[in-house]
Amino acid sequence: IWEGRYRSSLIDPDYFLRCQRYIELNPVRTGYESSPQDSAWTSFATHIGENAEPWLVDHQHFWRLGNTPFERQMKWADFVKEGAPHWEDRQITESLIRSKPWVSDIYAKKLFKNAPEFAQIRHRGRPKKINPLNSVG
């Protein structure tokens, strides 16, 4: 099931449903399944009411999709089936690969107010040593 290294990334709470859609569509995107509801590895079938998983607790943003279970299921199915824009998939993938937060500018300012250096993407490894003798041109 797992391939490569475990990856995680901080996300803006308002982006949660987009990330969940990314996960639900991943088997389709990679060619393992033809439809998200065919996958046994996602919660899509549960979220559209085809399957009951008593251990699954829905996120508060999922509950905001509608007042009734049927309304939430329909809105979720429509949201997932419309798919994500290509740029959004790229941003989420890059965020995971680089362990970079995927947050809005407003959320980033609030989150990194006391430590702005953590908001920047840094390259792997140790920073290059600066030699003051070689920097004079």
Feature annotation, model-predicted:
Residues I1-G137:
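Short Pro-Cys-Gly-centered "Cys-loop" motif that presents a nucleophilic cysteine in a tight turn
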